[in-house]
Amino acid sequence: MCRAVAGVTRFVFTLALGVGSAHVTHAMKKKTSVSEQPEQRTYEVRTFGCQMNVHDSERLSGLLEDSGYQPAANGEEPDVLVFNTCAVRENADNRLYGTLAMVKPMKDRNPGMQIAVGGCMAQKDKDAVVDRAPWVDVVFGTHNIGSLPTLLERSAHNQRAEVEILDSLEEFPSVLPAKRESAYSGWVSVSVGCNNTCTFCIVPSLRGKEQDRRPGEILAEVQALVDQGVQEVTLLGQNVNAYGVNFADEDLPRDRGAFAKLLRACGEIEGLERLRFTSPHPAEFTDDVIDAMAETPNVCPQLHMPLQSGSDRILKEMRRSYRSKKFLGILDKVRERIPHAAITTDIIVGFPGETEEDFQATLDVVEKARFSCAFTFQYSPRPGTPAATMPDQIPKAVVQERYERLIALQERIQAEDNKELVGTTQELLVQETGGRKDAQRHRMSGRARDGRLVHFTPSEDVRPGDIVEVTITDARPFFLIADGPLVNHRLTKAGDMSGAGQTPTTAPIGVSLGVPTIGIKPQADATAAPKNVHEGCGCD
């Protein structure tokens, strides 16, 4: 790919991972021809699911803007509406098709409008999406998000639906441009896919086997973000601490210590103030990663470590490859090296065959672990997973009752631990959004270095992306409050960009580093896509 920006020509090498066979079907339908469509078309991306989907949506937005589309103004109907979907839980099906039914009147009002469905649900359902929602124009999967502009053009030209699902990854998403959501915080993928075989999880069948990016490409993308003022980067992967086992570049040797080395290398990037990662797998979490976290100043004192169940018997049925003793041992090691680390987790309630004794084991581990936050899920059978056909599926009423007990326990723990932070000083990266009542109470919100959400009373010149220090005055289970005067306020480049309505647009990054550009958001009454609906995945 070759692209010129500001007089600089960028040559980007695309990593070829092999193109799987494409499953393509066509459904004839009436459309407005290309010649009748306006020259400058608008788009909106709606995201359902995990952080990987949020980052993929940044790529989709970058692709569309690179192809001449503009973000639709807030409240206006777009010419192209893209759904980036999730398939992890059962209600994902109902949510997608219910939403598609709701937007059909929009399509009826504007026959030239195009609707595209991508992501995990599209990868799973393929042409069934068009069967169930014939007004959909394009269906694309997790392996070929770069095909979206071409599929939209082809569908409009041929006046028929285009469904293209690849069986394996076409190219790393990093070779695509990205319209970043935030001026101060960014996602960077270290890998795609997953080699684990958890019996409840559909993700490996939809995302494929793990493929790891070259370290230099990851560092180049982080540097490109930091050069544009981004202060916080989160490294993304289905199992980040398996990084280095399956490099897509066959010339790179297998390296089980690669993730710890990557953390340390990110620590050398000047201007990167906060580094996070998600999600590791307890079975492969090693001491060298803990050491790298403790010894690299910009790595935040936060760890997301999925538990899923505290019962060793259920963990075995889940095919999780660790037991509760090992899990708690990891937490002990982390807290020994990083005493104030905030540890979060995922837990599934009601896995097939879970007895009251099994559930009590989960409660016991939660009590001992004292998570700062737990993303809890009621087990949802997914067709095609081993757990979906296991005997002894738990009645919904039983699952609900256990779920409520777990929530009550975790809220108590969070309330107790958060109260201990009252009176402490916390450094916050100010967010654009945070609390539902921020405007009503004249507050802003930010994240502490350990990831806790803090609502605070700002001075007049505080902007999203700035760094402030506050004194905690009160605590709730899910957030902290700082209602006193600011201890300190540091203006930042990210704050300047936020104030100007700007976010980075990073160029494709292959072997060489692309030169990032600056994307201008619409004014205050026009919010750029994508619009995200975040749902924790619970599949790590």
Curated annotation (Swiss-Prot):
Gene3D superfamilies the UniProt entry points to: Methylthiotransferase, N-terminal domain (3.40.50.12160), tm_1862 like domain (3.80.30.20)
Q: What is its EC number?
A: 2.8.4.3
Is this entry keyworded Lyase? no
Q: How is the cofactor bound?
A: Binds 2 [4Fe-4S] clusters. One cluster is coordinated with 3 cysteines and an exchangeable S-adenosyl-L-methionine.
* Residues given in the record as [4Fe-4S] cluster 2 binding sites: 194, 198, 201
Q: Which domain of life is it from?
A: Bacteria
Entry's PROSITE patterns? Answer: MTTASE_N, MTTASE_RADICAL, RADICAL_SAM, TRAM
Its subcellular locations are: Cytoplasm
Provide the binding site for [4Fe-4S] cluster 1.
50, 86, 120
| Reaction catalyzed | N(6)-dimethylallyladenosine(37) in tRNA + (sulfur carrier)-SH + AH2 + 2 S-adenosyl-L-methionine = 2-methylsulfanyl-N(6)-dimethylallyladenosine(37) in tRNA + (sulfur carrier)-H + 5'-deoxyadenosine + L-methionine + A + S-adenosyl-L-homocysteine + 2 H(+)
Q: Name one GO molecular function term.
A: metal ion binding
- EC class, as a word, reads transferase
Keywords for the protein's UniProt record, in alphabetical order:
4Fe-4S, Cytoplasm, Iron, Iron-sulfur, Metal-binding, S-adenosyl-L-methionine, Transferase, tRNA processing
Q: Which residues belong to any copy of the Radical SAM core domain?
A: 180-416
Residue ranges of domain TRAM in the record: 419-486
Looking at the UniProt record for this protein, which Gene Ontology cellular component terms does it annotate, in alphabetical order? cytosol
Q: Which residues form the MTTase N-terminal domain?
A: 41-157
Cross-referenced CDD domains: Radical_SAM
Entry-linked InterPro entries? Elp3/MiaA/NifB-like_rSAM (IPR006638), Methylthiotransferase (IPR005839), Methylthiotransferase_CS (IPR020612), Methylthiotransferase_N (IPR013848), Methylthiotransferase_N_sf (IPR038135), MiaB_methiolase (IPR006463), rSAM (IPR007197), rSAM_horseshoe (IPR023404)
- Tell me its family: Belongs to the methylthiotransferase family. MiaB subfamily.
Per the entry, what this protein does is: Catalyzes the methylthiolation of N6-(dimethylallyl)adenosine (i(6)A), leading to the formation of 2-methylthio-N6-(dimethylallyl)adenosine (ms(2)i(6)A) at position 37 in tRNAs that read codons beginning with uridine.
Q: Which NCBIfam families match?
A: miaB-methiolase, MiaB/RimO family radical SAM methylthiotransferase
Could you identify this protein by its name?
A: tRNA-2-methylthio-N(6)-dimethylallyladenosine synthase
Give the species this sequence originates from. Corynebacterium urealyticum (strain ATCC 43042 / DSM 7109)
Provide the taxonomic classification: Bacteria, Bacillati, Actinomycetota, Actinomycetes, Mycobacteriales
Q: Which gene encodes it?
A: miaB
